[in-house]
Design a protein with these regions (language model features):
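N-terminal capping segment at the start of a domain
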Residues: 16, 20-47, 59, 102-103, ...
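Proline/glycine-enriched tight loop/beta-turn segments at coil->beta junctions
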Residues: 88-94
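Active-site-adjacent substrate-binding region
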Residues: 37-40, 67, 178, 187-287
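Acidic/histidine-rich catalytic neighborhood of metal-dependent amide-processing enzymes
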Residues: 78, 105-209, 213-217, 222-225, ...
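Structural recognition of the beta-strand scaffold that forms the well-ordered cores
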Residues: 65, 83, 94-98, 140-143, ...
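A non-catalytic alpha/beta surface segment that caps or lines the substrate-entry region
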Residues: 29-87
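Extracytoplasmic/secreted proteins, especially bacterial periplasmic and envelope-associated proteins
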Residues: 23-26, 30, 43, 47-63, ...
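Sec-dependent N-terminal signal peptides
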Residues: 5-14
């Protein structure tokens, strides 16, 4: 399909509006203001999950919280994921969009970009899906706890929320067409990459949609591998892709620091990121 033809089809399909971007930004702001810190598998993390549940529900979406225990290097901890499902047709396949909300433990980190930005983005997407339901494909949004590792990624350290989500989706026997993991996409100087550890066809899909939306200058394919919430899906055979901006501040110096604050992210970047994700969902519905 040509870029021009895809552009025309996407223009008539599911869209992400400026109002959705505004909600995304204000939601991120609320998370940072009231839920910092929100370290993985902690009572503060559960406070954040409850607030996310309330914010998603306020869009009119049918949201639920899944609380579970998982092992960590510091023993068993209680984690909390939040889900919202938008079923267009029981026989249609599913697109899963996932973002973590937790912050890195052991440091003072507001996590405005790393966690809150795409948490807000998914709330904006929930609002869009309630307001403008998409046809021909079902969408599941997942806000995960436990993406961040306590020490370093390894067995029982990090990705607990996405590992749990994979198990739930397998138990439901959902026909998943694509998993899109979004992370750190609020950066005012947005430069998103698609890491090498992703499904090739989905990577090309994201690049094609970015081109059709005039976003090629801020979305590119990378040779690096990134450990993120898409990895457990890949490990279980689901087609998955990660969209992440891993150049946050000079030499990524704002990442996992007290400098990860709201003044570093923008509504405009969330609008571009939301438009890209909505475009990919629409393109998958057209296929």
């Amino acid at each position: 399909m040509s870029t021009k033809m895809l552009s025309l089809l996407l223009a008539a399909a599911f869209s992400f509006t400026r109002a959705d971007a505004s909600l995304s930004y204000s939601s991120a702001e609320e998370i940072v203001k009231y839920c910092t810190p929100r370290d993985a598998g902690t009572p503060r993390g559960e406070i954040a999950a409850n607030r996310i549940l309330d914010m998603v529900s306020s869009t009119g979406a049918d949201a639920r919280k899944d609380s579970f225990f998982a092992r960590t290097p510091l023993g068993r901890r209680r984690f909390n994921n939040v889900y919202a499902e938008f079923e267009a047709n029981p026989t249609s396949s599913w697109v899963v969009v996932v973002s973590h909300f937790d912050t890195k433990s052991g440091i003072v980190c507001p996590g405005a970009n790393d966690g809150a930005s795409t948490t807000g983005l998914l709330i904006g997407l929930a609002n869009a899906l309630v307001d403008r339901p998409i046809k021909n494909i079902n969408v599941m949004l997942i806000w995960t706890d436990g993406e961040e590792s306590l020490y370093s990624y390894g067995e029982n350290d990090g990705l607990q929320g996405s590992i749990r989500a994979v198990s739930n989706i397998e138990a439901l026997k959902r026909n998943v067409k694509a998993v899109i993991c979004v992370d750190m996409l609020g950066d005012k100087d947005l430069n998103a990459i698609i890491p090498a550890n992703g499904t090739k066809e989905l990577t090309e899909k994201v690049l094609s949609v970015a081109a059709s939306l005039g976003l090629s200058s801020i979305v590119s394919k990378s040779n690096v591998h990134v450990k993120d919430d898409h990895q457990p899906f890949l490990d279980r055979g689901f087609p998955a892709v990660n969209i992440i901006d891993f150049s946050y501040g000079p030499k990524n110096s704002w990442w996992h620091t007290s400098s990860d604050t709201m003044d570093k992210i923008s509504e405009e970047s969330l609008f571009k990121a939301g438009s890209l994700v909505a475009g990919v969902i629409s393109s998958l519905a057209i296929d």
